[in-house]
């Protein structure tokens, strides 16, 4: 043991220095997320690298038609770039929206109230717990955020029933607390392990573009692999490796293609994965018929809200609106673009 210690001490010092310079490596969750990202990038490089390594005709084709490989490399780079953009994007946290509302409301208050709020904002937990806790201080009026959230629910709703039991913030409709991020997410869809972040209101469109580019890249790469196998006979071990990669690629393509179709349907109907899967467990959606999409405003407006970044909070529809949306479409409705 005494012989190993001199060798272990430099290693421990190097490890401590690495953790000091890279704090993300000291957190097991962030470390595993970083390793998954590196594995995904490495997998992309493996698929394109084997073609360059094994297929001499592919290299010659690249020299003859540089535009072909140029377009492929452009798509390859755009896909990885979109992956990192989506991974680093915010899904739309309630605490951020609450801070924006409180700051906008503070502009219309007198200076003394504003200074008190700025002093209390130094600790986010104080702002959320003290002002939002109407149960402990019944005489204190609700915060601007609390008023905004209450307006999104039917009259008579208690603010206590809308408060998250984990981060103690008032939740608008379509909000859920993510235990991986330890925050409440607006229009929560799901927590993506491969991206290391939640998919929510503010990055659902980025996520859709990523899986769209990934699907296109998989199809293009699959075509190149099939073209490689259809050429002149090659050594069996090369064909075995290519066939193995081709099977993995085909499985990946099926997965991302189904994911693309599924999320396209969600966007067109203004739904989320959580609302679709856990519909019966959400109190305000429990009694709504399954064929009714309570937050849908028509295909055109749903697309506009997603593509143009219209991050408005959705209010619960009234009984009249639900009845109107549950009515089946007729030919006249189609001509009037009621579905849009």
From Swiss-Prot:
<dbReference type="InterPro" id="IPR001594">
    <property type="entry name" value="Palmitoyltrfase_DHHC"/>
</dbReference>
<dbReference type="InterPro" id="IPR039859">
    <property type="entry name" value="PFA4/ZDH16/20/ERF2-like"/>
</dbReference>
<feature type="domain" description="DHHC">
    <location>
        <begin position="162"/>
        <end position="212"/>
    </location>
</feature>
<keyword id="KW-0012">Acyltransferase</keyword>
<keyword id="KW-0472">Membrane</keyword>
<dbReference type="GO" id="GO:0000325">
    <property type="term" value="C:plant-type vacuole"/>
</dbReference>
<comment type="similarity">
    <text>Belongs to the DHHC palmitoyltransferase family.</text>
</comment>
<keyword id="KW-0812">Transmembrane</keyword>
<keyword id="KW-0808">Transferase</keyword>
<feature type="transmembrane region" description="Helical">
    <location>
        <begin position="34"/>
        <end position="54"/>
    </location>
</feature>
<dbReference type="GO" id="GO:0019706">
    <property type="term" value="F:protein-cysteine S-palmitoyltransferase activity"/>
</dbReference>
<dbReference type="GO" id="GO:0009651">
    <property type="term" value="P:response to salt stress"/>
</dbReference>
<dbReference type="GO" id="GO:0099402">
    <property type="term" value="P:plant organ development"/>
</dbReference>
<feature type="transmembrane region" description="Helical">
    <location>
        <begin position="207"/>
        <end position="227"/>
    </location>
</feature>
<protein>
    <recommendedName>
        <fullName>Protein S-acyltransferase 10</fullName>
        <ecNumber>2.3.1.225</ecNumber>
    </recommendedName>
</protein>
<dbReference type="Pfam" id="PF01529">
    <property type="entry name" value="DHHC"/>
</dbReference>
<dbReference type="GO" id="GO:0009705">
    <property type="term" value="C:plant-type vacuole membrane"/>
</dbReference>
<keyword id="KW-1133">Transmembrane helix</keyword>
<comment type="function">
    <text>S-acyltransferase involved in protein lipid modification. Catalyzes the palmitoylation of proteins peripheral or integral to the tonoplast. Required for the tonoplast localization of CBL2, CBL3 and CBL6, but not for the plasma membrane localization of CBL9, for the endosome localization of RABF1 or for the endomembrane localization of RABF2B.</text>
</comment>
<keyword id="KW-0926">Vacuole</keyword>
<keyword id="KW-0449">Lipoprotein</keyword>
<keyword id="KW-0564">Palmitate</keyword>
<feature type="active site" description="S-palmitoyl cysteine intermediate">
    <location>
        <position position="192"/>
    </location>
</feature>
<feature type="transmembrane region" description="Helical">
    <location>
        <begin position="66"/>
        <end position="86"/>
    </location>
</feature>
<feature type="transmembrane region" description="Helical">
    <location>
        <begin position="241"/>
        <end position="261"/>
    </location>
</feature>
